Amino acid sequence: MRIAILSRNENLYSTMRLKQAGEARGHEVDVIDTLHCYMDITSNNPKIRYKGEELPQYDAIIPRIGASVTFYGTAVVRQFEMMGTFVVNESVAISRSRDKLRSLQLLSRKGIGLPRTGFAHHPDNIQDVIRNVGGAPLVIKLLEGTQGIGVVLAETNKAAESVIEAFMGLKANIMVQEFIEEAKGADIRCFVVGNKVIAAMKRQAKEGEFRSNLHRGGSAQLVRLSKEERATAINAAKVMGLNLCGVDILQSKNGPVVMEVNSSPGLEGIEQATNKDVAGMIYEFIEKNAKPNSNRTKGRG
């Protein structure tokens, strides 16, 4: 098969592993810088051009769209959909998952376990926002943050007020969530491909830190999932419409709760923690499912 990886950096671990794994299975794999693609929108024969030439017809596209380029990246993915190319994650599903509020609203509607969450931009009564999620300790997040950036743990109501006021000064949309203390600074990353959890790791925050992101110095190890945790991860992926994603779960006293669904999960941490060929399993999914015009949305919106 001829497959393209949409990635701005061919030297990232995930991009290199996907190229290596695909070529090892006999596929022709190109890495294409998403931002350097340009499109012929009005033509009856939709095209994508790159470095002065029309891109060939690919059998499948693996989008690795960074959060900072979601708007243009999903436009490129949508153009591939209009051309009838199979995409591992469709543009509408990527957009859905990148909007943290929209994600939580959709998950909530389907009865997926979530931490108690509030959303605000410029509330008239900050104390009521805090009371509404059960009071401190609580976690306050900037809606646009990634890799644990823009996430603050407020241990008292007064501290929470101060943080919310500071974020309001930035004219930012903020999310206020109950702090799942019983998780003890750990979460579970479930790697879902094709409605199956193919790998899972437990990430533990470093001493004195509550964010378990590996980018923030957390550690990771193999974990055995309960049936409920596995079902939660699979259902969350289905709600988002993602064929490939990382579902981050906390173990609360009320059962597993979903913190985030990541449409472009990194491969390095999960492969090292589990010793599994995650990249190879992504290609197994592509080989079984990549057919022309088989996307559910077909680029319609």
From Swiss-Prot:
Q: Name one GO molecular function term.
A: ATP binding
Which note does the record give on the cofactor?
A: Binds 2 magnesium or manganese ions per subunit.
Residues bound to ATP are: K141, E178, F179, D187, R211, S212, N213
Instruction: Kindly list the cofactors needed.
Output: Mg(2+); Mn(2+)
Keyword Ribosomal protein attributed: no
Identify the residues that bind Mg(2+) 1: D248, E260
GO BP terms, alphabetized = protein modification process; SOS response; translation
UniProt keywords, alphabetically: ATP-binding, Ligase, Magnesium, Manganese, Metal-binding, Nucleotide-binding, Protein biosynthesis
Q: What class of enzyme is it?
A: ligase
What does the record give as EC number?
6.3.2.-
Query: What InterPro entries does its record include?
Result: ATP-grasp, ATP-grasp_RimK-type, ATP_grasp_subdomain_1, RimK, Rimk_N, Rp_bS6_RimK/Lys_biosynth_LsyX
Q: Which residues bind Mn(2+) 2 per the record? A: E260, N262
Span of domain ATP-grasp: 104-287
Kindly list the GO CC terms recorded for this protein.
cytoplasm
Question: Which family does the UniProt entry place this protein in?
Answer: Belongs to the RimK family.
Listed PANTHER family: RIBOSOMAL PROTEIN BS6--L-GLUTAMATE LIGASE (PTHR21621:SF7), RIBOSOMAL PROTEIN S6 MODIFICATION PROTEIN (PTHR21621)
Its name, as the record gives it, is Probable alpha-L-glutamate ligase
UniProt source species = Vibrio vulnificus (strain YJ016)
State the taxonomy lineage: Bacteria, Pseudomonadati, Pseudomonadota, Gammaproteobacteria, Vibrionales
